[in-house]
């Protein structure tokens, strides 16, 4: 969906010669959506899953698609840089990034419902990250993998998280969701309602491969 939206905006900005907006949106996508979010939650899949893992292969395929899109979107702005990258990646093509067609993204990639779902989930992740930062500041945990997370949610959010692997998306050793509670020791952000978090230090043995901490048998 995000690729569909970016490409639609690219076409609009390009026709209007509005390269500043184009550049700003692409940079924000790289720094906020990719670096600060997608790369963060997918690095364990790339590093720790088996080479034959379907999830790992899907991630690699998506990264290849994103790279191809970014090269074509950035080509009118960063002509030499994109050409250099293209020649490194596609050195056997004997071609140029500037001879490639601009992307044509099928309309079925547009999925506003899915985008809204992820935006709501990012609210939960924001509260969880803020709660873990306090634990880090107090020297109670080091990395997020030293944390066990329990999120307290209203019914709408509880239904939302059924489709998410919470520990993977929070980058913690363990995570679970439960119904909202009025306990006083729970962390919350005033600007985000219906989400509370309890962070405890994970106990057990640290896996030497993924670095997650698992309780013994």
What are these regions (language model features)?
Residues 164-181:
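A glycine-rich helix N-cap at a beta->alpha junction
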Residues 1-8, 40-131, 138-158, 178-196:
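Acidic, turn-prone loop/beta-hairpin segments
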Residues 14-21:
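Short helix-adjacent coil turns
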Residues 207-210:
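Short cysteine-rich clusters marking metal-coordination/redox-active sites
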Residues 212-215:
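Short functional micro-motifs and their immediate structural scaffolds
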Residues 196-205:
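Immediate flanking context of iron-sulfur cluster ligation sites
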